[in-house]
Amino acid sequence: MAKNIQAIRGMNDYLPADTAIWQRIEGILKQVLAGYGYSEIRMPIVEQTPLFKRAIGEVTDVVEKEMYTFDDRNGESLTLRPEGTAGCVRAGIEHGLLYNQEQRLWYIGPMFRYERPQKGRYRQFHQLGAEVFGLQGPDIDAELILLTARWWRALGISEHVQLELNSIGSLDARADYREALVTFLEQHVDVLDEDCKRRMYSNPLRVLDSKNPDVQLLLNDAPKLSDYLDDESKQHFAGLCELLNQAGIPYTVNERLVRGLDYYNRTVFEWVTNSLGAQGTVCAGGRYDGLVEQLGGRATPAVGFAMGLERLVLLVQAVNPEFKVPATIDVYLISSGEGTQSAAMQLAERVRDVLPTLKLMTNYGGGNFKKQITRADKWGARVALILGESEVAAQQVVVKDLRNGEQETLAQADVAARLALMLG
């Protein structure tokens, strides 16, 4: 007997029971994005490897350890995208969307990172990202945060997420801070674990979000990034905080929040939750005003965020039991007797012509009346349409309300209008 082939570790199948809740959540997310004037963009899953090395930074965990990279048959190095911002910027430059233009874009789809699979973190995962190009004030940063806060309210999870903010300043300001931080770490190298020692010179800001308790204790005495910010970054951050205060959005300034990708500057933010066990990030982003130029375009201010959908779905299911998925089927069409199958098929098509959004399933599995009613219940149908030989001959149909058991016989020409009343 042949061995079963199974899904790759960390890359999951999502079955109909799963995709129903995904579709409802995604529908809410997309509706809010449309309400803020964002347009969808779709990029390839595979990009040239240098794109991510230049955008994310060669000395990052993503590039060093986590990317799925391979050579194609022409020897070109390609990578399954580990995130969406780099590809979005590449597409914007390539198609002339960015220079001297304002763009508000969103994308959704699978990303790939070779990580240890755990709850809410997988090797193939799904992100929804939003990116804004051509606007540099703190007001658009604030609007992105307001957009995400509207999502949380719509999903019923507002009480279970907290906003953390920081400013990491300009490139020059970070260079000065980096020098001061390295000097401090060198004086306490005995406290650092191997990972922090490796990062100390290659990417010292990443030491700030070490999970090692001893390192966290040490960092209480480390130089503060806020003391090294340039005046423009300070003003930008103060403006953002004031806008959020006026909008009634609570937040915490977390001076150790630096994000794991090298392209960020000024504003960085995360929405975090404690409702999935250990604290986890649900949504994160910030400014990346230098990335467009870094990837070959004209200097363009930019800001955006990305959200992991697996973790969001888990959070909604964990904290909002009232979040329900609509029934798969509204109406189940039952037929029994000689010549009724064709009549049922034709009736179903006529009803769909009048009610195109109706979810109507026709029974094609045979079986007696009782079995077909059981199938209707299994699919969650609210109404059954029943066709027997006598109904077909008389151009009629029995309409049965499966919630209260009441039924009536109608002319087939009237059934669509009746269904609209019953299900409206």
UniProtKB/Swiss-Prot annotation:
InterPro entries: aa-tRNA-synth_II, aa-tRNA-synth_II/BPL/LPL, Anticodon-bd, Anticodon-bd_dom_sf, His-tRNA-ligase, HisRS-like_core, HisRS/HisZ, HisRS_anticodon. Keywords: Aminoacyl-tRNA synthetase, ATP-binding, Cytoplasm, Ligase, Nucleotide-binding, Protein biosynthesis. One of its GO terms (cellular component) is cytoplasm. Disulfide bonds: none annotated. One of its GO terms (molecular function) is histidine-tRNA ligase activity. Belongs to the class-II aminoacyl-tRNA synthetase family. This is Histidine--tRNA ligase. The lineage of its organism: Bacteria, Pseudomonadati, Pseudomonadota, Gammaproteobacteria, Enterobacterales. The gene is hisS.
